[in-house]
């Protein structure tokens, strides 16, 4: 499927999605948003893709919603219409976090602000460099957090630190971002995408059904009590048996002291 506002590259079971509006620091317009939703659905159905990397073209990851677009400006009359108009902003978080049943990595080149920061937080992991910067920005627009930030940020950095970042709307530079957990890996800027790809290939090596179920189990664990989560873990183990070759291969390679070859079957 051709895209106008993003690039899609697939190699070695790893997909790289590059937001391509560099003149706008990859701000999310309605058209880009629709393509993000479409590429999520495409990658979900592609069994040859095991890990997805999100990044941005040019000098920024994503500066948030493009407020110059008519949809973002809000041409509506009633409160219900206003809610409908703003509702589209967060749907990419649902697609990436909930519906894209594959590990996701954000490679943060430059700034991730507002809904762009939320996009990064919706990914399972984040790789950055000394140029990476985060900014919640909503309070500066006389807005409360949206696009999933109020869900993701406290879970990643803790409640009080999340309040700090939202209330002050200050920039979080790369070193602090790494220290507080906004970034999981910090690499030289020239190696950013390679670093993300190295991480993706490490993940893609493992049995895909087990990886997919691990994502679901871990997500569920952030919202469940212990008893419910133990039941869901058991469900995950049973589900993983749907790939009998990989189950047998894991045991055989361990016995034979050789690297495993997982197929997803």
Indicate residue ranges for each PLM-predicted region.
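Conserved CoA-thioester-binding segment of acyl-CoA-metabolizing enzymes
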Residues: 1-57
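Terminal peptide-recognition signature
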Residues: 17, 21, 36, 54, ...
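Crotonase-fold acyl-CoA enzyme core
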Residues: 30, 95-211, 244, 248, ...
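Hydrophobic alpha-helical membrane-association signature
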Residues: 32-35, 89, 192, 233
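Glycine- (often His-adjacent) and acidic-residue-rich active-site loop
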Residues: 56-96, 112, 142, 225
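Localized chelating/binding microdomains
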Residues: 82-87, 140, 144, 173, ...
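Helix-loop "lid/cap" segments that line or gate small-molecule binding pockets
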Residues: 165-166, 177, 217, 221, ...
